[in-house]
Amino acid sequence: MSPERPPRTDIPRNLSFIAALTERAYYRSQRPSLEEESEEEPGEGGTRPGARSRAHVPGRGRRARSAPAGGGGARTARSRSPDTRKRVRFADALGLELAVVRRFRPGEPPRVPRHVQVQLQRDALRHFAPCPPRARGLQEARVALEPALEPGFAARLQAQRICLERADAGPLGVAGSARVLDLAYEKRVSVRWSADGWRSLRESPASYAGPAPSPPRADRFAFRLPAPPVGGTLLFALRYRVTGREFWDNNGGRDYALLGPEHPAGAGAAEPQGWIHFI
């Protein structure tokens, strides 16, 4: 005689299983093409309700809906929960305007609100750093040499055969001219100069610029040199070669000197901010 079967006391469907059924029903309604999953009905042998009848997949264990293994199923369930979906709302759905369009006529400039004008006037000086003192460039620090205006220039020219007429420094360099006695038709005039105190030197030729006013009878030659170095001095002397002879004008042995600017032109700190126009 078989022992009497104990009365069935387990709950046929617990709360987690019911939640899983509700979730699956929701996604089936949203995606009808989702693969349907069949479930076995409770049998005589005490088969646990809710076990899936899906085909056996090698390497994949079967687990109950009410107890996900490893927490992975719980994360999947949470990610599929309809309560955690992100929603996008547009401004027009909330009664707001998507864009604000303002049209202005050419003859009617827009009105700037009073509070904007007050703010601009109050912050006008705070928005910009104080202007640095304007750098002294070559044109502003113009250094000119005009020996032709000095007394005794004609006597010096007669004695030296060559004299500096003028020389001035500009933003593009040094421009000058020299007078030489007209001793022969063929003559060569050049300028020897240095920007490092004669540690190195170069020589630039001068070009014929026409006859000079007399007396004495002389010709004028023009020349151009680089600008004096910043914070330094450009030294130069004149050289005249004619009929196999050579004459110099080196300012009585002191050389001619043109001073360079103390700071490079346009130097100074850049403006931290630019103008901002408000409409």
Curated annotation (Swiss-Prot):
UniProt motif PP1-binding motif: location: 87-90
Region (Substrate-binding motif): 248-256
Residues that bear Phosphoserine: 16, 33, 66
Annotated stretches, region: Glycogen-binding motif: 176-198
Transmembrane segment boundaries: none
Domain CBM21 residues, every copy: 154-259
Biased amino acid composition, Basic residues: 51-65
Alphabetic keyword roster: Carbohydrate metabolism, Glycogen metabolism, Phosphoprotein
InterPro entries: CBM21_dom, CBM21_dom_sf, PP1_regulatory_subunit_3
GO-annotated biological processes: glycogen metabolic process
A matching Pfam family: CBM_21
Positions of region (Disordered): 28-87
Source superkingdom: Eukaryota
Functional description taken from the UniProt entry: Acts as a glycogen-targeting subunit for PP1. PP1 is involved in glycogen metabolism and contributes to the activation of glycogen synthase leading to an increase in glycogen synthesis.
Comment text on domains: The CBM21 domain is known to be involved in the localization to glycogen and is characteristic of some regulatory subunit of phosphatase complexes.
Protein name: Protein phosphatase 1 regulatory subunit 3E
GN (gene name): Ppp1r3e
